[in-house]
Amino acid sequence: MGPQTGKRLLVMAGGTGGHVFPALAVARRLASEGWQIRWLGTADRMEARLVPQHGFDIDFIDIQGVRGNGLLRKLAAPFKVLRSVMQARKVIREFKPDVVLGMGGFASGPGGVAAKLCGIPLVLHEQNAIPGMTNKLLSRIATRVLCAFEGAFGSLGTTVGNPIREELVALGAKPRESRTEALKVLVVGGSLGAKVFNDLMPSVTARIAQLQPVTVWHQTGKNNLSTVQAEYQLQGQDGGVKIAEFIDDMEAAYRWADVVLCRAGALTVSELAAVGLPSILVPYPHAVDDHQTMNARVLVDAGAAFLVPQPIATTELLADKLQLLAGDRDELTRMGERARAAAVLDATERVAEVCRELAK
């Protein structure tokens, strides 16, 4: 379908990078074709900072999650949601979008209901293998339901993959250099860090280093750097370790790595597949409906990753997995190839195309 200059898209995505970054990929694609993009989010979550940084205007509504909270808050929730729906409807009436795209986060619920009330086509995209509560509810009124992983919505959803940045898709298409030197382990714990990685990786690194060379790039999360750094020093491993609270350039980190130790958020799993990297996945055990374990199964079942449930994660187990990979570089390469084979590389275009179809 050709360019649709002047068409308007309202994007609802927020709370975590797993919602915001896939939405940004779609927004950038349509903006490059002349679409006007506007965002609906909440003022106290990461979209308030990220979205304007990428050049898009954002409107805020007042909404908070209600799942798992106290009784009093649940009783007040319907009134708060009604107010949020009215706020979202005001934004929709002013912006007059041709399509509303909901990709998760607190604003998606009221925004999706408001889109239905205003008669605007609503497209949902679920990034996880198990749908969140908001998308489960909105799927009943959505015009189109899209999902990253097959079966997330049963027969109701169309599987399209997770939109990711074009730079990562391009990175995965490039041949990797021969893996002959020290094993390069990228440890990614997310913006707040993963305590299990921060606690175990210094001793894991020391254990591996007794048998073979290893280098580590460890992302600790906010306020954890000095503690983790001290532990690596205590283990005598600070020389071969790069430690950072955040990694701003994930493309560079993925390019550097031989293997990734990380959680199993939907975006992370999709990025690992796209760049063709083997991984050891330790799903966050308190994720709603244990959806990270289901996300991980995509790569594990493809033979591209090891699954280590957090309750059994130990220094010995993680070190054994990494030593296994360090000692068999051919298998490391094969796992990377299997990861790439499991990737859906045109997800951004698939979601954008649905928006184009509904905006005719």
UniProtKB/Swiss-Prot annotation:
Enzyme nomenclature, EC number: 2.4.1.227
Subcellular location field: Cell inner membrane
UniProt KW Glycosyltransferase keyword: yes
Sequence positions that bind UDP-N-acetyl-alpha-D-glucosamine: T16, G17, G18, N128, R165, S191, I247, A266, L267, T268, V269, S270, E271, Q292
Gene3D superfamilies given in the database record: Glycogen Phosphorylase B (3.40.50.2000)
GO biological process per UniProt: carbohydrate metabolic process; cell division; cell wall organization; lipid glycosylation; peptidoglycan biosynthetic process; regulation of cell shape
Keywords: Cell cycle, Cell division, Cell inner membrane, Cell membrane, Cell shape, Cell wall biogenesis/degradation, Glycosyltransferase, Membrane, Peptidoglycan synthesis, Transferase
Name of the protein: UDP-N-acetylglucosamine--N-acetylmuramyl-(pentapeptide) pyrophosphoryl-undecaprenol N-acetylglucosamine transferase
